[in-house]
Amino acid sequence: ENPQFLDIKSYIEKISSKQFPHHIFTYNRNNNANEQRASQIKFEHLKIDHIQKQNRGNELAKLALNLAKSNKERHQAIQDFMLINDSTTIAAEVPIYLTNWDAGYYRNQKGFIFPLNNHQTPITGHIDLMQVRNGLIHILDYKPEADKIKPIEQLTIYAMALSRKLNLQ
């Protein structure tokens, strides 16, 4: 075991326990459920230049898509394929949440300014795939139309939430 990643292991193991706040991931469609989902939140951020890279992960994802019999099955096919065939993939569908407390930490301790400080409920989501490559944690989210929906806010929330849950500096 690599001591550097014990916090990831602990977080993933905690997910199946009673200690994990499963209730915050139950969305009530009638009560503004979209307000608490990371995938639905948009906010102002620095201009980000998109750099597209091709790597082994891209190649594996293309192979995985061949296993899907329909568009609906693509997401699950990629996750299953990566978990089985990619040694850097350590988990799929990892539930993650960012609380007002977390947002306050980023504002007061790190000087971040973003419009999530007074959100009514925890902002939640599920990281499609989590990988550890070259000593770094990678968060992957399958978006077939990423160019249209621009998921940077969602991935930023996931990274910030994961950083708080793992006490990363």
Please name every model-derived segment.
Residues E1-I48:
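Nuclease-adjacent, charged terminal/linker segments that flank catalytic cores
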Residues K150-Q169:
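Metal-dependent nuclease catalytic cores in nucleic-acid-processing enzymes
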